[in-house]
């Protein structure tokens, strides 16, 4: 093959969670991914890198459970399940001549990012107040992800990886920072916290904003520094 490595990031995400979409999610995120990996192996590609997601561990939690090496994936929706099944299909193809890298990043942010980050940015630019809830999230800046992937290829790695930024993020502090960069002022308040705490676990939107979802920092360490931006 003329290719040393394939980085597979294509897939369906941030689309409707309507049950009617389930078959399409599995077809694209699982079946086509495994099909591409099989072709890569057949054609002599040495390394296949698959972009999975922290979502394989389920949604955010009210309590501060930390994902460790022993944490068993328990996806709560067909997006997470399709990613996890794709992982298993790729792992089954691994051999001495065909290395597989599974990357489970947390929420990725940066210019042009999709998903929850743009929603938070929109909130930061429009609302005068925001709930100051004490939560923690693992996040990954796009430049740090790119450097991590570069090292995966350069070092001809194989295995399961969990890259993240050096520090966890508190949603309210992130929203306040975004507002500041856009020269907006937003005040953090706690009078809404009792309502938020009741809603965590009951509302997917509230879970994503104010729930806890973090990797053990030791899980994300690598022999070379990839966390080049704070």
Predicted regions span which residues?
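NAD(P)H-binding glycine-rich loop region in Rossmannoid oxidoreductase-like domains
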Residues: 1-31, 35, 39, 56-59
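Active-site segment of SDR-like NAD(P)-dependent oxidoreductases
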Residues: 13-16, 54-58, 73, 106-109, ...
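A conserved pocket-lining segment of Rossmann-fold NAD(P)-dependent short-chain dehydrogenase/reductase
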Residues: 18, 122-140, 144, 148-151, ...
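Short alpha-helix in the Rossmann-fold core of NAD(P)-dependent oxidoreductases
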Residues: 26-33, 49, 82-83, 138
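Catalytic helix-loop patch of NAD(P)-dependent Rossmann-fold dehydrogenases
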Residues: 27, 62-108, 129
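Conserved Rossmann-fold NAD(P)-dependent oxidoreductase catalytic core, especially the SDR/UDP-sugar
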Residues: 34-78, 101
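Mid/C-terminal beta-alpha module of Rossmann-like enzyme folds, strongest
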Residues: 148-207
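C-terminal amphipathic/interface module of NAD(P)-dependent oxidoreductases
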Residues: 169, 177, 205-230
